[in-house]
Swiss-Prot record:
A motif (PDZ-binding) lies at residues 573-575. SMART domains: BTB. Keywords: Cell membrane, Cytoplasm, Glycoprotein, Ion channel, Ion transport, Lipoprotein, Membrane, Palmitate, Phosphoprotein, Potassium, Potassium channel, Potassium transport, Transmembrane, Transmembrane helix, Transport, Voltage-gated channel. InterPro entries: BTB/POZ_dom, Ion_trans_dom, K_chnl_volt-dep_Kv, K_chnl_volt-dep_Kv1, K_chnl_volt-dep_Kv1.3, SKP1/BTB/POZ_sf, T1-type_BTB, VG_K_chnl. Residues 1-52 are annotated as: Disordered. It holds the Pfam family Ion_trans. The lineage of its organism: Eukaryota, Metazoa, Chordata, Craniata, Vertebrata. A motif (Selectivity filter) lies at residues 444-449. N-glycosylation promotes the cell surface expression. This is Potassium voltage-gated channel subfamily A member 3.
Amino acid sequence: MDERLSLLRSPPPPSARHRAHPPQRPASSGGAHTLVNHGYAEPAAGRELPPDMTVVPGDHLLEPEVADGGGAPPQGGCGGGGCDRYEPLPPSLPAAGEQDCCGERVVINISGLRFETQLKTLCQFPETLLGDPKRRMRYFDPLRNEYFFDRNRPSFDAILYYYQSGGRIRRPVNVPIDIFSEEIRFYQLGEEAMEKFREDEGFLREEERPLPRRDFQRQVWLLFEYPESSGPARGIAIVSVLVILISIVIFCLETLPEFRDEKDYPASTSQDSFEAAGNSTSGSRAGASSFSDPFFVVETLCIIWFSFELLVRFFACPSKATFSRNIMNLIDIVAIIPYFITLGTELAERQGNGQQAMSLAILRVIRLVRVFRIFKLSRHSKGLQILGQTLKASMRELGLLIFFLFIGVILFSSAVYFAEADDPTSGFSSIPDAFWWAVVTMTTVGYGDMHPVTIGGKIVGSLCAIAGVLTIALPVPVIVSNFNYFYHRETEGEEQSQYMHVGSCQHLSSSAEELRKARSNSTLSKSEYMVIEEGGMNHSAFPQTPFKTGNSTATCTTNNNPNSCVNIKKIFTDV
């Protein structure tokens, strides 16, 4: 044993010391030692390296190392075969995160295809896999002195271009979108790069909806806002749909001659209608009290439900400002305003001894606003939501369509007016009068109420119809593509709703990957919800506390402290 110790402590031969060539030796900070591997051989079985040491391969085999700066020569020797010696570097060397990246080059092997770049290129993004020396060290191959990744080769051209261009991400045309998305996640380019990629590919950013902080408020919000959350929520949605349908039916039926209020439609009511209304059982509505009218009673009940639903949702919503800016909530407000205006007008007429309190035209416009209640059905209809999302995403194309139609209408209405100017039987008395004909012709409707009679006018009409077909056909494929995207996103089981509740903890970036895994591994049915609560807790432990929303159970990870449980919450549901 003493002989072996003396052999290990003996200095190496001078000839070997002169042949040594110092390799790159980045050292880790914090007082940790850096070990230099001088051979291809793996460490002996049972030998483990300390967790705070970084292994850096040397350039030469079976040769001792001479430290830069005149350090003492290493101690130890090599047996016959491969040598497996490690040596702590002097503490004066730079740390791993502070190494000089200017002139050094690195070789990256992607499934047999080698790429060579400079370390300073990778160091531009230290938060990524290739930019962080500690993260990429696990993929280092000491036999070939290169980094090896068994990944998609065509995708790495774009990944390396991301570093070379300073953050520009472009998908190769021969790489599918899903594969390139996985490569972005593997190389840990970050959420910003993923968002840029999705925007360039035409994906819309998924809307994140916050949940209320209080449990009772959250339960009420889910009950009235998300019908799939529980059985009672579906029941409330059914009641709301029935009330909307009843309100629309009443709005239509009260315009029939048998039920029409004569004082509201004096100009449009014929003598036959008066006679029919007089012979009907409800023909005396004009003389009867409006408060006892059956239509008014049913309308009042519908308005009571609409008002109750709107107030409950307003007080339970997580953000009053966001709630007030939502277009669907504005429609709810517009749907109930005409009732209160009509009620106030009726009361004013009673106090004024039957004198008309408001212009009849204004009153009709106010009552017409009631028809917007039909848009309340979109809250409970996926088809209407898809249509609304399609129109919203296609606003640019629709704007171009309207602009093209406007140019065509001006052009062809002017042309047909001058072409028909010499014919006294022509119906085109002016250019604005020809606007209607141009719109009807370009949209290929062709009512026939106005038509050219001269040869020149017919030629203009033919060109107008052809131009209309071409103009309308140009933006239609883009609109159809948007519709297909939203339709398949709804029907292929992708994420339907995403609600985020951000508490005091701000660890958003660390939790994004776990949320994506939970979304991809989700096996929930349409009526089930999974609540993932993350933050300053142990994610691997997952102690669960169920919270009920009707007939569905949501699991909440707690840390023996319910107040600190909710930091980031997302609810996922599959169709």
